[in-house]
Design a protein with these regions (language model features):
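N-terminal Rossmann-like NAD(P) cofactor-binding module of classical short-chain dehydrogenase/reductase
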Residues: 1-2, 28
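Oxidoreductase cofactor-interface core, primarily capturing Rossmann-like NAD(P)-dependent enzymes
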Residues: 5-7, 17-26, 33-152, 163-172, ...
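A generic "functional-site adjacency" signal
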Residues: 9, 97, 204-207
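A hydrophobic C-terminal alpha-helical subdomain
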Residues: 121, 159-219
Length: 219
């Protein structure tokens, strides 16, 4: 896992090279859902490029491709509470948002599985999604229920979302948030057949829901 920064690709490749030099040959890499379909988004393109490296460098690797993090809603919770608007453009196709707790548990399970394997396991990619496919209207309805006051969906305008994000993050990062949101609006972020069932089976429990986070943020 490496941060979304201007030198993210350098960080990823340096880390993998140093790991190989240290004799580490089993890794779990945190990529992003549909990394290969949104390569115009810089931090998606970086992760898609880095996904190629484990096999090239001879690692036994699991590549995790999580959907949009539910936890990122902390960045916009104040807007929801103070202005009664949910600002992220996610349209009517929906996004299978995922909780970071589920991501970390799946990552730990995969690290342990590879560590305990008698030999190198092949490179494998796992989509990590949440229990529900949520549209803008769905999310606004959850916030309405949790806060006890009507919350409107702000609409499918990535440009407005960029302007909002630029109030508390660097302009280049706010722009990335805009072009990241564009495929949410055009295509959604939809799980594939069997994704959810596989994830529930791995830790042996239900996945955390968006409503859990909304309840925590409402306080």
């Amino acid at each position: 896992m490496n941060a979304v920064t201007g030198d993210e690709f350098t960080q990823a490749l340096t880390t993998l090279n140093v790991a190989r030099q240290a004799g580490i040959d089993r890794v779990v890499y945190l990529s992003v859902f549909d990394a290969d379909k949104a390569v115009n988004v810089p931090h998606f393109a970086v992760k898609f490029g880095a996904e190629r490296m484990p096999e090239t460098l001879g690692f036994s690797a699991t590549i995790l491709r999580p959907a949009c993090f539910i936890d990122n809603e902390a960045m916009i919770a104040d807007v929801v509470r103070k202005h009664n608007v949910y600002p992220m453009p996610i349209d009517s196709r929906g996004v299978a948002m995922v909780d970071a707790r589920d991501i970390t548990e799946i990552a730990a399970i995969e690290l342990i599985r590879r560590d305990r394997a008698a030999g190198k396991l092949p490179v494998e990619t796992i989509n990590i999604v949440g229990p529900d496919i949520l549209t803008g209207a769905d999310v606004a309805a959850i916030w309405t229920e949790v806060l006890g006051s009507p919350i409107a969906y702000g609409g499918d305008a990535p440009g407005g979302f960029e302007a909002s994000m630029a109030n508390f993050m660097p302009e280049w990062m706010a722009y990335e948030m805009r072009i990241m949101a564009e495929p949410y609006v055009s295509d959604g972020m939809i799980l594939q057949e069997g994704d959810r069932e596989r994830l529930v089976k791995m830790p042996g429990r239900d996945l955390h829901s968006y409503r859990e986070t909304a309840l925590a943020q409402a306080g």
